[in-house]
């Protein structure tokens, strides 16, 4: 199925060579696992029918925003509130660093005394705990919110409360809140497209492949999976999906799933995982089976980079959470300054493999900071 995609900052491994979530049980057969994933995905899709950041027409890259709107004026003593998913995942810890260092940089440039307060749950299933964190920030009176929801629905009521209090809300990656004022994050559908293209190139466009999916409730999991499948279909690829199953963003579940698939599918050549944590679990299963299987993840966490250097993980689609946070912070400040922002700002991402794993991230994505000025 061909889909119109909002173009973010996208760098593929091929271009570089030329110049960081269903059932948790192992299935009895690949067919059964495919049927299970299909049903859970279909049940979850309705929550984002109203808004899809990957296809939203009112969208720009951060470079396009800067070209159109210019410098960012920063008022004194602003407080931005950021609520993330689990701090046990390196992706979210890196996002936190991006928020905090963005504030430091902006204060150095402007003397504005900007504060970004970051909170996160201890695991990726505590939907109620995450909601409480957002409510606390609303009651505290933050000037804007940057939210990365666990699911597409757990923060809906909190977003409405924030809007009632005239607090603008940025939905930052992962779960999609249809009622949020704005969205900033990587194009999840493109994650899957990049992975499928890279695997196809490595395998000569033929071979059995499998997909380890995150949580069925998560927008990113569904979009990454669909992007992977659509690339295969749209390009009449010889890649053959023989198994797919949710592992709920859990490394051990992904490892167990992969171990079963390797036994059931002796011709399995590649496994695409919706995030790096699951991919690293799959790498363990592949090593233990002494199999020759490509493993591709998503997120670009440090452990994934290390595994690529060591010859374990084959590739990751780096969504650069550090720079996602810096983009989101910039966007929130632009809104507070009264600038007319697009509904969606696409953040940088790139495929990382052995060819570019040691290149500087800022160089890969061509990163520069915005110009910030004091009010």
Show which residues each predicted segment covers.
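A residue-level marker of the well-folded mature domains of exported/periplasmic proteins
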Residues: 14, 21-375
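Generic cytosolic/nucleocytoplasmic N-terminal low-complexity/intrinsically disordered segments
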Residues: 1-3, 33-34
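Sec-dependent N-terminal signal peptides of Gram-positive bacterial secreted proteins and lipoproteins
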Residues: 2-24
